[in-house]
């Protein structure tokens, strides 16, 4: 629906809100013909669907960026991801633990979910299409940071899962989380991203 961005730019509401409302209405009208939206009833399908949505949204943010990577060009984005986002995760987790009486696992999950910027909902203040030189540093920083921080937040989601598993006595450890979910997956994500970026 190519007319949707033009409409939402006039009324000041993200088109994601309209798609969400459309999904609610469609399920309300045709619920007997559609699968259950409850995650526990369709775990595998919902897992892969949410992964696909994250990949598409991050790809959409990535293809808008035409500034070559360097520490100088990306310094603000990297500071937002590696400093500001980590502080937001810690702050949200601390508030959840001390003020909402959540467990450590639930508090960490709250921080990991709330801290990242959504690349879809933030699109109204992001960069215009590639090769247009009018974008400000602020708009570039918001776009690049929105793409980077989702990937950097995933290890903390797994940290919350690890704490929950440890509380239930399951066979896992913080060392495994750090070596696999934090070090290995981040490095492989960067390597695959560089290779695909060069190839395409």
What does each of the following model-derived ranges do?
Residues 1-200:
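Transmembrane helical cores of multi-pass secondary ion antiporters/exchangers
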């Amino acid at each position: 629906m190519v007319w949707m961005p033009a409409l939402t730019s006039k009324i000041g509401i993200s088109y994601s809100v309209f798609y969400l409302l459309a999904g609610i209405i469609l399920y309300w009208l045709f619920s007997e013909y559609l699968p259950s939206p409850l995650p526990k009833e369709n775990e595998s399908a919902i897992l892969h669907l949410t992964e696909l949505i994250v990949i598409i949204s991050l790809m959409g943010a990535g293809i808008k960026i035409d500034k070559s990577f360097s520490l100088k060009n990306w310094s603000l984005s990297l500071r937002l991801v590696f400093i500001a986002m980590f502080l937001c995760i810690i702050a949200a987790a601390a508030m959840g633990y001390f003020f909402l009486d959540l467990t450590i696992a639930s508090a960490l999950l709250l921080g990991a979910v709330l801290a990242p910027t959504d690349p879809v909902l933030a699109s109204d203040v992001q960069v215009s299409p590639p090769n247009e030189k009018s974008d400000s540093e602020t708009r570039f920083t918001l776009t690049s940071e929105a793409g980077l921080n989702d990937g950097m937040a995933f290890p903390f989601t797994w940290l919350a899962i690890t704490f929950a598993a440890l509380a239930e006595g399951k066979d896992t450890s913080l060392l495994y989380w750090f070596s696999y979910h934090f070090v290995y997956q981040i490095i492989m994500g960067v390597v695959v991203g560089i290779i695909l970026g060069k190839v395409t």
